[in-house]
């Protein structure tokens, strides 16, 4: 009897760990690489203390996006900027450096996210002397600050962690959705307002702020001789009207800077489709049959215009625990779309980054996290155990269906 128990023990132990994603023998990212795209997820500074989560990132992903720590409102140092002798902004990279350093040391490439985003941006950045009690600065001053900021941030990470940051979301969410948020007749739907508040980049840099940001980024990348792609990133990018506006914006950016040979410099390499799929805060609109084909068509549409495509913040929303199997099948269908896109004739999709990696059933109903990612939208459960969604996606990537 003891001999039987001893023989069975390794099998029992294997069964016990098989439900944990960090113990899978072959990572999902290695399987995705067979189909020509990276597989990514996200990381917050607080998660740097969660070793199990870090182990899952190392096991299954080869790209990581910092949720907030590489954004301007995190990097900018108000007090130091006010004291800067040259009048240029000062950044504090402590948190971001720790995270990018971890990624480098563990073999993950980094999506830089994001250089210019009007939402949550520090108001003081736009004032004379960085002092909110002073008037807003003039256009030339704000443009110089932004050029300096973009140059310094890209340069910092490339020189400190060479080759680790492989792309940047240069501008985030500059295309508005609703009438009144953009000027009538503007095919780009360039955002003037967000929830009633002014887009301060547009207001104080001008209508060319997106193109200027890409120009500043392109100049920096070329000066560094770095292999870094430059992306425009937005939500709802697979809906027809939004996609048309994004394409109009991309065309305006890529016809902005003459190349000296009668053409234009290509400033924007690609489009990041955020990939929040389903209703915001509600099951209505979730797991709808038509979305996978819409996503496929949008990716091909961007690719046909010479733009690379990444899915940058994917959350396959599900607010009902009872829909777990349907959610898993839906996730698998999305990955069937992704794996079929890249062929020897073309490679339109180069990364899929999953934002809602884990379930979060304790998120308060109506909260931002609950509404954005949904409580049951993960590949993993709240204890980081694998769900049917994980296994079905794995099967698609393996070709084991």
Please annotate each region the language model reported.
Residues 44-60, 146-156, 242-258, 295, ...:
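Short, acidic/polar
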Residues 15-23:
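Sec-dependent signal peptide cleavage junction
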């Amino acid at each position: 009897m003891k001999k039987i128990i001893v023989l069975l023990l390794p099998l029992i132990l294997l069964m016990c760990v098989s439900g944990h994603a960090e113990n899978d023998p072959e990572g999902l990212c290695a399987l995705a690489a067979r189909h020509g795209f990276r597989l990514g997820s996200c990381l917050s500074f607080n998660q740097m203390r969660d070793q199990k989560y870090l182990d899952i990132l190392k096991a299954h992903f080869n790209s990581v996006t910092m949720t907030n720590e590489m954004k301007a409102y995190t990097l900018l140092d108000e007090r130091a900027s006010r004291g800067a002798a040259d009048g240029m902004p000062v950044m504090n990279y402590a948190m971001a450096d720790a995270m990018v350093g971890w990624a480098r040391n563990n073999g993950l490439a980094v999506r830089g996210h994001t250089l210019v985003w009007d939402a949550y941006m520090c108001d003081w950045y736009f004032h004379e002397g960085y002092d909110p009690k002073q008037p807003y600065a003039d256009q030339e001053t704000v443009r110089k600050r932004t050029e300096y900021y973009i140059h310094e941030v890209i340069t910092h990470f490339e020189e400190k962690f060479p080759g680790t940051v492989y792309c940047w979301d240069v501008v985030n969410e500059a295309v508005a959705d609703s009438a009144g948020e953009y000027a009538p007749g503007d095919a780009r739907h360039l955002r003037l307002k967000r929830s009633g508040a002014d887009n301060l980049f547009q207001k104080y840099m001008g209508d060319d702020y997106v193109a200027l940001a890409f120009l500043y980024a392109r100049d920096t990348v070329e000066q560094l001789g770095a292999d870094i792609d430059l992306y425009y990133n937005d939500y709802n990018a697979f809906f027809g009207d939004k996609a048309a506006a994004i394409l109009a914006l991309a065309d305006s950016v890529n016809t902005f800077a003459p190349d000296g040979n009668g053409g234009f410099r290509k400033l924007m390499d690609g489009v990041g489709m955020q990939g929040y799929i389903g209703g915001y805060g509600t099951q209505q609109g979730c797991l709808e049959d038509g979305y996978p084909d819409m996503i496929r068509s949008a990716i091909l549409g961007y690719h046909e215009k010479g733009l690379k495509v990444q899915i940058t913040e994917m959350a396959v929303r599900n607010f009902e625990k009872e829909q777990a199997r349907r959610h898993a099948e839906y996730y698998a269908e999305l990955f069937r779309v992704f794996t079929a896109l890249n062929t020897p004739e073309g490679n339109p999709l180069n990364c899929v980054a999953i934002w809602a990696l884990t379930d979060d059933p304790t998120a308060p109903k109506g909260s931002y996290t609950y509404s954005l990612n949904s409580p049951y939208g993960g590949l993993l459960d709240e204890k980081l155990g694998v769900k049917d969604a994980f296994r079905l996606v794995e099967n698609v990537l393996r070709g084991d269906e």
